[in-house]
Amino acid sequence: MWRILSAIALALIVVGCSTLPEELPLGPPGQALAPQPGGPLAAAETALQARLGPEGGPEVSGFHLLDANEAALRWRLALIDSAQHSLDLQYYAWWGDESGVLLMSRVVAAADRGVRVRLIVDDLTTNTLLEIAQERLSDSGLAIVAAHPNIAVRLFNPWRQRSMVGKLFESIEHLDRVNQRMHNKLLIADNRAVILGGRNIGNEYFGLSPEFGFRDLDTLGLGPVARQASAVFDRFWNSEQVVPAGRLGIVATPADLRQAFVGIDAALEAAPRLERFEVAPQDWRDALGDLVQGMHAGSSRVLSDVPGEDDEEEVVHVMPALIRDLLEQAERDVTITNAYIVPDAAAIAWLRDQTGRGVRYRILTNSLASHDVPAVNAHYKAWRDDFLSAGVELYETKPHAAVQPLVVDTPPVVAGFTGLHSKAMVIDGARVFIGSMNLDPRSWRLNSEMGVVVESPGLAAELLANIERDMLPENAWQVVLDEDGDVLWVSGDEVLHRQPARHFWQRVEDVFLMLLPKEIY
């Protein structure tokens, strides 16, 4: 049922077999609305400034770490419900399951009360999910949502071929273009509050999937950081790689929208997985007041790759150099949690230089047992001993980590296993990076990526404590070399001599995927 509702409530499929021209007409330029007086978020920002006092300033924002999956969904609902003027949302993936439909229903409710909504989604995910599910639908969910007079939808790097067969041939003929994806994750409300980090929109990111749950991370920022994020959003909104849904022949009417949402609320109310969430929009003023009192103060920079402009079809990848420069400023220690890591010889040599000048490096990533993308592990595993020889302390997540009930699962759902999805780092106990960027070839050379750097000892201390908790023996294996140079996985008294896996076929898959080039992942 949820795959059907996704077409009603989300941008997840374009029907038909039409072929579009290679050069697509672009939409009119647009920009974020300046922060307006009035509304819960304006009051929250004012309260934050008053609380910070001399500690505040024109460049200082408040930050709240979204560590637990349930809280990550709840605060997205809070910002959407609290918006009075504008919502700008940018996501790589927005699945049509319970969480995706719930969030989109609240976005439509915001538009109903006059909020201007702009949505950018990557066309790779909008066009595949329901086709794989073999759902047959008379109208595109994308068109239905875009039919709202207060909602504008644009697609990043859209398919020119709209049928599955056409997309297959397009992938072969134009692989370089098709392989460029937008991996950004961003929600901005009233240009005052922002959520950014590693989570897409879908049950596995919010503890609502019984198959598996992601250990992920976002931050909620209030203040100038929202305006910084809006500049990134506008850059994509006005780029050559983003096309309005209507220019792709994806059209519907407001009547289609009204008809589509008949029964949505009842279906959400009846969904067992959503028992801890209200379906109707809520008043979050008290929650926002409490939030403000506990936020960490810090100055910030929102970083992003640059979408192609002036007929350029390729993303300009500035993030790798920015991250490298950030790390080279470390004086004492760097602690990293990152889901997907595939280095090369140059990266290992660079790490050896960093540890050689006295900087302690600790890295937490996925094990084969916790991986949701085994192809990444197939190309990462050969580098374990290189990491260790370079002086890196290496940890790998357990699939049944003790921390799962605390931060992964949202009752009543219990995930079958936990996989790491976060992308964050703490530098010298005072500087934090949280974003969408993995440490693999796709993130460095193909996807657009983004993140925020925050100068905040308080936020850094909280994030560091959480990563160190995830490195404890009940949550991860420490990967070490024995006296013969062989790799071991150590967890308390447990010592494993081959990489842990959930089952035999995972090991078979791991061997097979080594044969495929790592660059395609």
Give the label of every model feature segment.
Residues 1-6:
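Bacterial N-terminal signal peptides that target proteins for export
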Residues 17-185, 189-521:
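Charged, low-complexity intrinsically disordered terminal segments
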